[in-house]
Amino acid sequence: MALPWELEEDILSRLPPISLVRFRTVSKHWNSLFNDKTFINNHLSRSRPEFIILTNSKIYSVDIIDHNNIDPTIRLHEIPTYDIHSRGTDLNRTIINTCDEFLFYNYRYWDNMTALWNPWLRQVRWIEYANQEFCVFGLGYDNSRPEKVYKILGHLFCHGKVLRDQKVVIYECASDSLRFIDRPEDDDWPITETAKRSNVSLNGNLYWFGCSNYENDEYYIRIFDFSTEDFKPFCLLPCQMSHSTDELVLAVYKGDRFSLLKQCSVTREIGVWVTKERISNDNGNGGEGVEWLKLMTLSKPNLPKLFGTVSYFIYGKTLYMCNGDDETALACIYIVREDVCKKFQIGSGNINCRHCVYTPNLLSLPLFIG
């Protein structure tokens, strides 16, 4: 007896993409779901964040098993590399983060290697720009338009000029063209290497930490608005650094808000704040236009000392982090809540890696048609 089609769809929408892709050939009906926007959105709403980890030779996804269980664990999947690794394996030059539901891969400016990537659909779209002196910062789009026309923010590297004097550039993906825009008038230029690795994309805009006073470590959130193509302060942080070696990490929370993680470098205590309202172009005015709520404080004695690039997400009342081990520098997944602090090492030996948080989905890559 065949199940009703609506029930089949509901069951399939709860499966991870790695399983769904295998079922495409079962029937024409099932295969058609990959082009059904309602099904794709239902599936995305039920997907949970994972970690994507790039090493010099392999790419992994790390899924959390039994989120709400008393003893959560992880599941490691090796992802086919396609031609990602064939173009470059020096991870010191590699940046990976997300723009909406896509992975954004960049292998620095001198190698002309930038791509959007959906590993579950086995899709990679390389963005080719003729000028190899283009140093990429991040990807976004004008959110005032009904369709998403993607753009890349960066600067042209001009030999013989100091970084402060580099020209700010927008690369138009649809027309394959570069054009200059005005440089920020304040001192927050050039964008630091740390900001390039840790910027956050939300609603088509890029966000990162700016500093109004480096002597006193006074940080705030800056935005590059792709609709107006300008740099500006977005909002103040709910906390400041107590020590110059404290860690501050910005992330997307529940798809439309921000979370902020702070770790004290002395006590290793971790605090997490989240924004009360969803983030939009209008609720940040450079000051106190965004309201933050303290979500959790974690002060276990075996908390790791976070350093370098930190990826994290919050699910329920649990904090999930990817970072190097503070003794061996090996990539590790940490699961932390009031009653749990677990560490899982990824691989063995001296593994250099890049990582980010990513929600698996069935969204096809854009064609970059304006």
UniProtKB/Swiss-Prot annotation:
Coiled coil: none
Keywords: Plant defense
Tissue-level expression: Ubiquitous, at low levels.
Domain F-box: 1-43
InterPro entries recorded: F-box-assoc_dom_typ1 (IPR006527), F-box-assoc_interact_dom (IPR017451), F-box-like_dom_sf (IPR036047), F-box_dom (IPR001810), Gal_Oxase/kelch_b-propeller (IPR011043), SCF_F-box_component (IPR050796)
GO biological process, any: defense response
Pfam families per UniProt: F-box, FBA_1
Superkingdom as given in the UniProt entry: Eukaryota
UniProt cross-references to CDD domains, sorted A to Z: F-box_AtFBW1-like
The keyword Calcium is assigned to this record: no
An annotated GO cellular component: SCF ubiquitin ligase complex
Keyword Lipid metabolism: no
PANTHER family, per the entry: BNACNNG10540D PROTEIN, F-BOX PROTEIN CPR30-LIKE
Function comment: Negatively regulates a plant defense signaling pathway which is independent of salicylic acid (SA) and systemic acquired resistance (SAR). Confers sensitivity to P.syringae and P.parasitica.
Listed name of the protein: Protein SUPPRESSOR OF NIM1 1
Source species: Arabidopsis thaliana (Mouse-ear cress)
Lineage: Eukaryota, Viridiplantae, Streptophyta, Embryophyta, Tracheophyta
Primary gene name: SON1
